[in-house]
């Protein structure tokens, strides 16, 4: 990219623009030629304008007559020092050693030049070129007459002014060129600052004239390379920023440059001062190839370096000058100079600085001041030598400490000291916190807190006497250091390291730069230090490279790089790494201190000279840190016993050694030691240590055995076997035999408190209960052992009519409230109370069912018999569905019976005896379903025969069922018989329960509806729905899930499964529909459906009950939803009595599919009477098995006993029965899986309930 300028010209005359496109110019203005016209003599130029300060100016451009301008004279030639690529179109790109003609030096940062071929013109950085002394200056002199011939008036005045200023030293020179050299080219404006606040470009404030003596310029540049020949190959300096310009016309800054050199020679006079406390110099810091102005102050034992600029852009360099830094004079490790350069190396913090003093005199002055202060600071060493020479023999090994803070006496044995007092350390082992010391000046002795003392030296001359040995050891790296005192050895190695550094520094300074740069494989000798291992045995001279993951990386003087574990180095080395990296290594320092303390103790035991522990050494360092804070640390508590405990609670007992002696792996000793010290344990508790204590403190089992063996041997203890537990464990008894946690006596899940008083009497009479109570009141080790639950009675299997009746009622209530088999006694009590209020109806139905059961099994209480019998058997025996239904009614109220859904009664059994329910439901359901199914429906009706519409035959049943059936007839005229059958069933159940149905209606109006629905073709519906009807019937289908849930009859609908679960609280089932719920559950698609819903699916069969009840029950009972799609809605909405209406409505609803039709959807089911259908479905038998209703298999029985049919369907229950309640499909319908476990043929007796027999069958 070529330059936009095609020439540099100078105005010969003034010209005033006469048009907008023309440009005003003055004589001697510098112009950049932009365009030449081939048509006329008007050329386009741009006027050069130099900005002043931060001013931003625009350089105007326009047309001027070509006769008013001429080419600008070349005032100097220059040579490129580095390659440069231009950044803007006004600049020039060039390569190293390119030659240029210089036209203007007015800008100290950017020089206006052109190539020798005069083809390219532009600006180049001033610190990238070097001006040459050539013939151009002579040419410049020849041009001067011309310049004087027509000078502008202001220039005439400026000439004498400049001449008078030539000898002035403070004339501001251009910043860049004076100090620019190939080695340290500095950004312009560096050298032109005044002693206090240098302006970046001071020469801009003065007009420059070409008339100035050119020789001075040449001499200034000619001298430059002399001092820095070795730096010619340096990399290029940073780019200067482009100037903003100034209106000053005169471009000649030559005079200022010559004066700059003179100023450099006098820099020590003009740029340093002394205010009585500090010597101050304004010099430069060199960081690589960059230099920054700094202010160096030395005095008061400090060396302070601060940046010397107010321009934030000057602080870009990341070096010591970018921030204030301060070191104590004693932290100055080495200092030397070479010509104008001063080299300093500090510690705390570590830093290596290179300063450019500007002149050799200034560098020597800085060296002299540093030498005086460093010597004065080291003078205390001479005083220590004098004191050591006077010390007596017994004081040879004493340490000398200095007080960091004032200490006031608070005890008789304490020593009053002031800050700065020096004392002998007499005894520092007796207590870590209080040291016995002797004041060197007063010879008084006493104890002083160890944190107030800083160890500074020793009272002997080991440093002098051990010198030859130390020098010998340094020549063999890694050889054992022969020394008696690790501390003195430590000091020796530090001094030796200092001398080695000084020697290496001198060699490095003398060596050529190129040689040093070539030796990249060797460490930086300026950073080499001596590293000593924690034992003081080995040492190595190496440079620190870094610390990573607990490894200290070092570069040895032989060029080998190594990584040393942090816990293997001395504490001082770790502190050095902490200072350099700013990373905490406390965890490693603690390990080193422990190891050193252990070694010191072992040496003292063996008779070796006791060496100071690393713990104390670290305390010195800690004290030094506290000294920086200038805050006295808290005074430790005075020891009261011979066992000294530090302020942090750590006992003096060496647990580490203890564990080693016990045979514990050394890798675990430290962790165990920390745990014991954290708990403030000392040797006094050794005899009390037990395995449980060790286990609590984190010891491993193997180590626990080792420690206990060691303690037993130490205290001559004989281990006695632990006495066996008196009460045995969780699975064993006192004799060690396996416990039989299952009791021969059935355990009641109902607490004695929840049972009626007669039962309570029985409960209290039981010894097992008392034992359990007594055990519960004991606080023994076997508190977690399995214990038998409180038993209500040993004779639970022996039912007594009176107790059983309330129990039965209570069971019903419990079933209503019980979700899982076991509920709290309180809930059961509440449950008992709740049903007791309506117990008249509930009990009577139950009694009725009991009566039915009684007819089958008189000895047992009416309620119990059906349950125990497995409802099916009793129901079947009853032959009359009525009894069964009544039983169901008893459980749920009659509706259940009437419906098998009515099996709410079954429901009760569900809780008490699900089996009872199932049979009841099965019977009721099957027949209705069978009847509905086809002819069987009628047959079923006959069976129910209550049958038939003759709801009248069974007045009791008629009312509730009538409603139900009423709806059913409406539902499907074809099913009139079925309805009758249904009616019959309900009648049977309802027989005595019609009233209960209302109750059920209340409890679960839906259930009644379901009854109605069952009465309706629900059975068939169920059948139809069983497959599609069931689900299809939105109610049912939905109910299966939702409807059911409403009814709480899980049985219904798909619910059977879902609802059953949902109804886990039988109470829910009952709750919503004690009657309805039950029926719904049992029957409503439930019996089968309830359990598996399959019955629904298969339904008729499995759900004969489901069938009839199935959809109906579900629909009517549960949610009506089931049945209804039709029934469910209406049935639910209407009470039982309304069932008829609902049924009618549902008829329409079911018109979607009359029950028959729905059944027809399942042709097989419709084709087959419910009975047949049930039979067709193997579930029927299964159901029978579930319910254990023999009658299930036989349709007649089925008819007679809805349970049978229900059972037929029960196969699905079986699915339900897969749960423990299988025997009680009804219970399953309700979702009380636990009931299944009870046999159908048995009576429920909650007092005799056990985990295996929750209903006490």
UniProtKB/Swiss-Prot annotation:
Share an example GO biological-process annotation for this protein. Answer: hyphal growth
**Quaternary structure (record):** Component of the PAN1 actin cytoskeleton-regulatory complex. Interacts with PAN1 and CLN3.
Function according to Swiss-Prot or TrEMBL: Component of the PAN1 actin cytoskeleton-regulatory complex required for the internalization of endosomes during actin-coupled endocytosis. The complex links the site of endocytosis to the cell membrane-associated actin cytoskeleton. Required for assembly of the cortical actin cytoskeleton and for hyphal growth.
Domain remark text: The N-terminal SH3 domains are important for actin cytoskeleton assembly but not for localization.
Q: Provide the species name.
A: Candida albicans (strain SC5314 / ATCC MYA-2876) (Yeast)
Bias regions of kind Low complexity — which residues?
137-169, 605-615, 1136-1168
Q: Where in the cell is it found?
A: Nucleus; Cell membrane; Endosome membrane; Cytoplasm, Cytoskeleton, Actin patch
What Pfam family does this protein match (any one)?
SHD1
**Membrane topology category:** Peripheral membrane protein
Its name, as the record gives it, is: Actin cytoskeleton-regulatory complex protein SLA1
Q: Where is the composition biased (Basic and acidic residues)?
A: 189-227, 493-511
Q: Where is the composition biased (Polar residues)?
A: 846-858, 1057-1075, 1082-1111, 1117-1135
The UniProt entry's GO CC annotations, sorted and at most eight, read: actin cortical patch; cell tip; endosome membrane; nucleus; plasma membrane; site of polarized growth
Recorded name of the encoding gene: SLA1
List, for all copies, the residue spans of the domain called SH3: 4-74, 75-134, 396-458
Recorded GO terms, molecular function? actin binding; identical protein binding; protein-macromolecule adaptor activity; transcription coregulator binding; ubiquitin binding
* Keywords in alphabetical order: Actin-binding, Cell membrane, Cytoplasm, Cytoskeleton, Endocytosis, Endosome, Membrane, Nucleus, Phosphoprotein, Repeat, SH3 domain
Region: Disordered, residue numbers = 133-252, 464-523, 596-621, 718-737, 789-867, 1057-1168, 1207-1257
The record ties this protein, via InterPro entries, to: PH_SLA1 (IPR056996), SAM/pointed_sf (IPR013761), SH3-like_dom_sf (IPR036028), SH3_domain (IPR001452), SHD1 (IPR007131), Sla1_SH3_1 (IPR035800), Sla1_SH3_3 (IPR035821)
Q: Which CDD domains match?
A: SAM_SLA1_fungal, SH3_Sla1p_1, SH3_Sla1p_2, SH3_Sla1p_3
Instruction: Tell me, using the record's free text, what induces this protein.
Output: Expression is regulated by NRG1 and MIG1.
